[in-house]
Amino acid sequence: MGSLRAILKNPEDLYPLVKLKLAARHAEKQIPPSPNWGFCYSMLHKVSRSFALVIQQLPVELRDAVCIFYLVLRALDTVEDDTSIPTDVKVPILISFHQHVYDREWHFSCGTKEYKVLMDQFHHVSTAFLELRKHYQQAIEDITMRMGAGMAKFICKEVETTDDYDEYCHYVAGLVGLGLSKLFHASEKEDLASDSLSNSMGLFLQKTNIIRDYLEDINEVPKCRMFWPREIWSKYVNKLEELKYEDNSAKAVQCLNDMVTNALPHVEDCLTYMSALRDPSIFRFCAIPQVMAIGTLAMCYDNIEVFRGVVKMRRGLTAKVIDRTRTIADVYGAFFDFSCMLKSKVNNNDPNATKTLKRLEVILKTCRDSGTLNKRKSYIIRSEPNYSPVLIVVIFIILAIILAQLSGNRS
């Protein structure tokens, strides 16, 4: 009923949702039959359905390299995230992880659910890795080595300052941006982007995730994970976990807004990076997550629900982003729309209001100066006509029947 209610409220979401559903089914049908690659792509669908969809934009050879790159780093991240592993065991694994990708026999039991399966059967990933061309292998090994060393450093060190925060985000996400740029260049489809721009692409995504995932991280057992920098949260509370208490709601929202404001300066670099991409498939692969990130920040800003549960874009809006993000004009339009939405939520009494508005105005000016805003459809301002709820219900039922028949024919 929740999905139907959302569609009745936002009927323009229906068509993109159906397209997304069909695309997801098509992607699942594309899983290779070989045991190793079949495991890798099926695992990709389990650990990140959204990434599994986005990766389908890429040409096959590059797609395979990016798939393995993602799974290797996801495995590394699983080791880092498992708070039950003693530090004296975890640190050496993180530091040497780049060597294990060459070992067809290596595996390490940790994580839960699908992540445990990934770690227990890591030999499928390492075997597929060894089938990649050498320059792809070298790029993946280099980034894995640097990321593992950075993660090991922060196992023994808390995120105290905003510089620490940027450094941690560089290790766990900025390096992903550098690695992807290397893979794109190795495929001979793109020029090699600068490290600073590639780093910003990763930092913007990672900071968005850290903001959104506050409650999940702080409630982690047996030990909480704390990525918000003390330099920011200590202005509002004595302990980071105090932000989730109702008595601290006003301070929590102010701290949240401070964190969102900290993420905004990366946007200009991201727009510069994306505007230089030539290959349409690589462009979509890079652009869709960035648009999702600015949309998520707009949802999170000034929203106490970040400290109560999960805040994310509605599925219909996500589907719309995936469907409409095709050109740089679409990207500038999306960043303009979501920045306007965020700007409308800024309370002048917020201690960081002036800084937030200044940073948003820089983004809005960049989007205006692109000269492309008249070429896009708004993500937020509804330009489509409102449809009769009865008509929407009828269409929804018909589409459900069609999808059920398609599913039956495939089985």
Curated annotation (Swiss-Prot):
The UniProt record lists the keyword Transcription regulation: no
Domain of life assignment: Eukaryota
Membrane topology: Multi-pass membrane protein
S-S bridge residues: none
One Pfam family matching this protein: SQS_PSY
Cofactors that this protein relies on: Mg(2+)
Membrane spanning residue stretches: 281-301, 388-408
SUPFAM superfamilies from the UniProt entry: Terpenoid synthases
Compartment list: Endoplasmic reticulum membrane
EC annotation from Swiss-Prot or TrEMBL: 2.5.1.21
InterPro entries: Isoprenoid_synthase_dom_sf, Squ/phyt_synthse, Squal_synth-like, Squalene/phytoene_synthase_CS, Trans_IPPS_euk-type, Trans_IPPS_HH
NCBIfam families reported in the protein's UniProt record: squal_synth (TIGR01559)
PANTHER family associated with the record: FARNESYL-DIPHOSPHATE FARNESYLTRANSFERASE, SQUALENE SYNTHASE
Stated family: Belongs to the phytoene/squalene synthase family.
Protein name from the UniProt record: Squalene synthase
Organism: Nicotiana benthamiana
Species classification: Eukaryota, Viridiplantae, Streptophyta, Embryophyta, Tracheophyta
